[in-house]
Amino acid sequence: TRIIPPPREKPENHLLPQKRLDKTRVLIYHSHTSESYLPVSGKTHLHNGRGDVVRVGESLATKLREVYNIQTLHCETIHDHYPFRDAYKRSEQTVKQLLTENPEVEVVLDIHRDATPGLDHKVKIKGKTAAKLILVVGSERMGLQHPHWEKNYSFAKSLLEIMDRLYPNLAHGVILAEARYNQHLHPQSIIIEFGDDKSTWEEVSYSIQLFSEVLASYLNLNSTGYSM
């Protein structure tokens, strides 16, 4: 089934969701809260603290709320303090609690930034440079129970299709990983990486603007009314 976004002449109006503002539709959190951008903070990580990715999450949440009236919950809890290997275990507990408190959430996003050597994360879109995105979907290949992974994968591919129609080349694509990355907790849960450790804030901020429209388009077309 092809997903065709609505006309784009008036994004402020045609992307307004039909749900009440007080219903939380999007949950944003960070398993690797310390991740940062060298041009922004001078560091790749703000260890035991809130790195630049938290600013990304808050900026995206603000766009969704203020531009598209999509009620969004942004969690700033630090998850990757020592020992760092337990970051996903900690964020799993956070997400479980937040979904219990907000069972109507339709989309769960774990916001990161990439650091793959040699991968170009810059793309020109309408004359401005944006930081490219990567969508990461977990699976059950490591043997852990993950009943939703195919739904997560379908969700990511739907976002990518809208993205490619609205803003071609904004994303590198969808990566299907072996670990489940807490995505077993919700059928529309993915990781999104905004740029890499060398991205500037201007590039990342532009990507946030573009992606917020993509996500709003998806939600407007696919109102699920989840109750976990």
Model-derived features: where do they sit?
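Active-site-adjacent mobile loop/cap segments within catalytic or ligand-binding domains
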Residues: 171-228
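Catalytic cores of processing enzymes, dominated by hydrolases/peptidases
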Residues: 91-98, 105-110, 115-191, 195-196
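Second-shell loop/turn segments in exported
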Residues: 14, 40-53, 77-88, 95, ...
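Structured segments of extracytoplasmic/periplasmic soluble domains
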Residues: 31-35, 59, 63-71, 97-105, ...
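Non-catalytic propeptide/linker segments at domain boundaries
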Residues: 1-27, 37-39
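Catalytic-core regions of hydrolytic enzymes
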Residues: 22, 46-122
